[in-house]
Amino acid sequence: MTTKKTSPDLLLVIITLLLLTIGLIMVYSASAVWADYKFDDSFFFAKRQLLFAGIGVIAMFFIMNVDYWTWRTWSKLLMVICFFLLVLVLIPGVGMVRNGSRSWIGVGAFSIQPSEFMKLAMIAFLAKFLSEKQKNITSFRRGFVPALGIVFSAFLIIMCQPDLGTGTVMVGTCIVMIFVAGARIAHFVFLGLIGLSGFVGLVLSAPYRIKRITSYLNPWEDPLGSGFQIIQSLYAVGPGGLFGMGLGQSRQKFFYLPEPQTDFIFAILSEELGFIGGTLILLLFSVLLWRGIRIALGAPDLYGSFVAVGIISMIAIQVMINIGVVTGLIPVTGITLPFLSYGGSSLTLMLMAVGVLLNVSRYSRY
């Protein structure tokens, strides 16, 4: 192992904290009306998000100082724990149901979403597998199939909740990691055909997914039903114009756009801060992606490279899906916007992941 740098990637730290700060401001702005109506406290969601942010930042700086090889050592145990929690959440009376998905476990006044932490555990485990078996990754039987086996076993359990959004991000992240490891294009084509068949099957197996597809193609066909959320999102994004209506001046958060502080927070941000504000957020994520790629390229070993690739891919895929949903480019999937959307498990997981990335940067050659 090369000598550790005196400090991690400072620009990555700054970008992360800047996104987090913007997120805290927007969570309050987006949720104040609903929080005041439901809890008689306009700061209800903002205070909880601030608590999650504090826990996440402490975890990020702690993990930043933990040798990333520790995750390699404990990756199997982490996977076992996450699999156990994923099964536990399916048990009636243990798992909590929200918006049709049994994805949470109650812990006092709060709840955790095990599938979020499975994403990071999967990255640590798959990076270990790929770094040890890279010479076999071009083999369909000895490399490609075993790598995907553990991924899809977790995906199937997550789909029992069901949580297509989180499962899609996890699988997409792992596919990028396997591709970077050197898997053959022909194997991905074969996987794509199987995946397309599976996707069609998943859509047809649940009426609400069919409604999501039809509302995506033509949301105005059912403006008060399946198309309501995306229409209200577009009503937020469009009027924002170039400079926005002003911070705190959103109209859609007045009970038009459901739960605007979660998956659709980018719509409120675009309405209040306009095209300029939305572009700034995309620019910040682009810089974060650039720093992550540099860290992956400069990592001293394959494990560090694969971990960095996995983390930055997870963030990038989640950003693309979330903004794609908000702008009507893809069907609604229920994915948070990293660092900005309200949600304790998602925010804590993302900050922990950045902590791992920062530790890899302390060994990076760039």
Curated annotation (Swiss-Prot):
Outcome, altering D263A:
Severely reduced sporulation efficiency
The keyword Transmembrane appears for this protein: yes
Superkingdom of the source species: Bacteria
Primary location recorded for the protein, binned into one broad class: membrane
Q: Which residues cross the membrane?
A: 10-30, 50-70, 77-97, 105-125, 144-164, 185-205, 227-247, 264-284, 306-326, 337-357
What PROSITE patterns does this protein map onto? FTSW_RODA_SPOVE
The membrane topology term of the UniProt record is: Multi-pass membrane protein
In the record, biological process GO terms are: cell division; peptidoglycan biosynthetic process; regulation of cell shape; sporulation resulting in formation of a cellular spore
Family indicated by similarity: Belongs to the SEDS family. SpoVE subfamily.
Identify this protein by name. Stage V sporulation protein E
What are the GO cellular component annotations? cell division site; plasma membrane
Q: Does the keyword Transmembrane apply?
A: yes
Keyword tags = Cell membrane, Cell shape, Membrane, Sporulation, Transmembrane, Transmembrane helix
Q: Where in the cell is it found?
A: Cell membrane
Question: What role does this protein play?
Answer: May play an essential role not only during sporulation, but also during vegetative growth.
Q: What is the effect of changing R212A?
A: Severely reduced sporulation efficiency
What outcome is documented for mutating S103A in this protein? No effect on sporulation efficiency
